[in-house]
């Protein structure tokens, strides 16, 4: 007999019949992903909050993005873990809507942050003289506000007003909806709208901005190499270090963006294509793609650990308890060049 999620069989979702060993393996893997996500992003949050040297416009955007990733690991992933391993939802229909809305909101907020970080890097690298004037604290606050508010309004509005299956109500209630389930369902219109809002438009902005940065950085490198070394050797040494630092930051943020696109691209492509293919994508594959997307929030702190020396030094100070020492917040995590 098939296992069911609800005691009223004719309206219940079907529970998976995986063995206990398979379930235990899945739970172990997903718990590892969740813990890695929480610990990694918490280190980023604490580092930027604690050390005054890290209180820069770019780092506040990174801090906000790490908060998004931390909340995804804290509020979304644990419930998704149970749903994925059991193929059942035990937390009620209202909380299903809250969970789905929060999931869409935080996933969308990540790429919004990355878009604004790319714009910040554009001015830092391509217009450094006016960077501090253009990317002041007010501008950063507006960017952070938009990164949180727009995804929140979009996600909660769409799910609680049930706009996500508008135009496909018959398919949803006849073939998808059942007691004990919490699947993410999109109609043709809502699928395209989600793809455009959460992925394509902000992702395209990022790609265009980083390509522009690449062209300008390449041109700057050519001009420096053509300059008279005897007359400008001192200037080159100072600017070379500064530009090397900026190029490294751009490279790091570019990798962060690339990881996001690689992780979320399969899910968003399936989201926009599935309604046009008459919903042929099985729920298990959809779960796999969702978790593959979640991995983006796990990988971001790892990118910082590999490419940012300040992250490694901050981590070392935390592990040895040095952040509890007096004036540890004023510790120099990296060398600052005087102007």
Curated annotation (Swiss-Prot):
Protein name, as recorded: Trace amine-associated receptor 1
Gene3D superfamilies: Rhodopsin 7-helix transmembrane proteins
Effect on the protein upon substituting residue 260 to A: Reduced activation of G(s) G alpha proteins in response to agonist-binding
UniProt-annotated binding residues for 2-phenylethylamine: 103
Tissue spec. comment: Expressed at low level in both the central and peripheral nervous system. Moderately expressed in stomach. Low levels in amygdala, kidney, and lung, and small intestine. Trace amounts in cerebellum, dorsal root ganglia, hippocampus, hypothalamus, liver, medulla, pancreas, pituitary, pontine reticular formation, prostate, skeletal muscle and spleen.
Gene Ontology terms for molecular function: G protein-coupled receptor activity; trace-amine receptor activity
Domain of life, per lineage: Eukaryota
Native species: Homo sapiens (Human)
GO cellular component: endomembrane system; endoplasmic reticulum membrane; plasma membrane
Gene (name only): TAAR1
Entry membrane topology: Multi-pass membrane protein
Effect listed in the UniProt record for changing residue 88 to S: Slightly affects G-protein coupled receptor activity
């Amino acid at each position: 007999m098939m296992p069911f999620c609800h005691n009223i069989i004719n309206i219940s979702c079907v529970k998976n019949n995986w063995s206990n060993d398979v379930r235990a393996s899945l739970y172990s893997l997903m718990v590892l992903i969740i813990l890695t996500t929480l610990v990694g992003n918490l280190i980023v949050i604490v580092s930027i909050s604690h050390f005054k040297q890290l209180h820069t416009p770019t780092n506040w955007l990174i801090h906000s993005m790490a908060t998004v990733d931390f909340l995804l690991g804290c509020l979304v992933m644990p419930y998704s873990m149970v749903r994925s391993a059991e193929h059942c939802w035990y937390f009620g229909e209202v909380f299903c809507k809250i969970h789905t809305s929060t999931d869409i909101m935080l996933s969308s907020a990540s790429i919004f942050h990355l878009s604004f970080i790319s714009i910040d890097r554009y001015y830092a690298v391509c217009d450094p003289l006016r960077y501090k004037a253009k990317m002041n604290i007010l501008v950063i606050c507006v960017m952070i506000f938009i990164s949180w508010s727009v995804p929140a309004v979009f996600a909660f509005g769409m799910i609680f007003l049930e706009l996500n299956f508008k135009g496909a109500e018959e398919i949803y209630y006849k073939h998808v909806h059942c007691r004990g389930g919490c699947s993410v369902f999109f109609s043709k219109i809502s699928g395209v709208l989600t793809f455009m809002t959460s992925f394509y438009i902000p992702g395209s902005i990022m790609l265009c901005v980083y390509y522009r940065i690449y062209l300008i950085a390449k041109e700057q490198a050519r001009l420096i190499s053509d300059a008279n070394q005897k007359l400008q050797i001192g200037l080159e040494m100072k600017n070379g270090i500064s530009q090397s630092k900026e190029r490294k930051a751009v490279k790091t943020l570019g990798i962060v963006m690339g990881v996001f696109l690689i992780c979320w691209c399969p899910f968003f492509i399936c989201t926009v294509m599935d309604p046009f293919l008459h919903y042929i994508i099985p729920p298990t594959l959809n779960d796999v793609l969702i978790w593959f997307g979640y991995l983006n929030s796990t990988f971001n702190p790892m990118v910082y650990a590999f490419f940012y020396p300040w992250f490694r030094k901050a981590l070392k100070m935390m592990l040895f308890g040095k952040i509890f020492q007096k004036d540890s917040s004023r510790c120099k995590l990296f060398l600052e060049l005087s102007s």
